[in-house]
Design a protein with these regions (language model features):
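A conserved beta-turn-beta hairpin within the catalytic core of GNAT-like acetyltransferases
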Residues: 68-80, 89, 107
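A short beta-loop-alpha structural element at the N-terminal edge
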Residues: 1-12, 17-20
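Conserved beta-strand-loop-alpha-helix junction that forms the acyl-donor binding cleft
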Residues: 110-125, 129, 138-142
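Conserved acetyl-CoA-binding loop-helix of GNAT-fold acetyltransferases
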Residues: 84, 90-103, 122, 126
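A short, internal acetyl-CoA/4′-phosphopantetheine-binding micro-motif in the GNAT/acyltransferase core
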Residues: 79-90, 113-115
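Conserved beta-strand in the GNAT
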Residues: 50-52, 58-68, 78, 83
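Charged phosphate-binding loop/patch that engages nucleotide di/tri-phosphates or the phosphate backbone
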Residues: 135-152
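Active-site rim helix/loop that mediates acceptor-substrate recognition in acyltransferases
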Residues: 26-50, 54-55
């Protein structure tokens, strides 16, 4: 994502986070703005990278990658946010995008999925199971599952 596309990504991220936050915390007010204190760091901090998911040249979603493991364990890369826009879902694009993202960094990866998001739970289980990764494990927590795996 180029710097001049930052506002477009922010709009997509906000829309995604509003829906996602409503899944995770049903008590919050629907449509309440989201707070992303590290958003600007994706263009200035080493290890943070924003990417578009493209379909035929059209923006079909985004991936935010950083090095901050949800488990607190050491990792080389983590999927911070991942979104395929609704019009592009159920076409295999998300799985292909996840696999391409995993190829961006060699080493230990992590991502977390909230249990309140069963579609996301199923998606990530399939995406990881079909990816060229090793040592895939899950850390089950009360409200979420953390996936860990290695890429070569």
């Amino acid at each position: 994502v180029r710097l001049d596309e930052k506002a477009a990504l922010r709009a997509d991220l906000d829309a995604y986070l509003i829906v996602h936050a409503d899944l995770v915390d049903p008590a919050r007010r629907h449509g309440e703005p989201t707070h992303q204190p590290y958003y600007d760091a994706y263009w200035s901090e080493e290890g943070r990278r924003p990417f578009w998911i493209l379909a035929g040249g059209a923006r079909a979603g985004f991936v935010l990658i950083n090095r901050h493991a949800p488990s607190g364990l050491a990792c080389d890369a983590a999927v911070a946010e991942f979104c395929v826009l609704p019009a592009f879902r159920r076409m295999g694009l998300g799985r292909a995008a996840a696999h391409r993202a995993f190829a961006l960094a060699v080493g230990q990866w992590e991502l977390q999925v909230h249990r309140a998001n069963p579609v996301g739970m199923a998606f990530w289980a399939r995406a990881i199971a079909t990816a060229p990764v090793a040592g895939a494990t899950e850390i089950p927590l009360e409200d979420r599952v953390i996936h860990r795996f290695r890429t070569a």
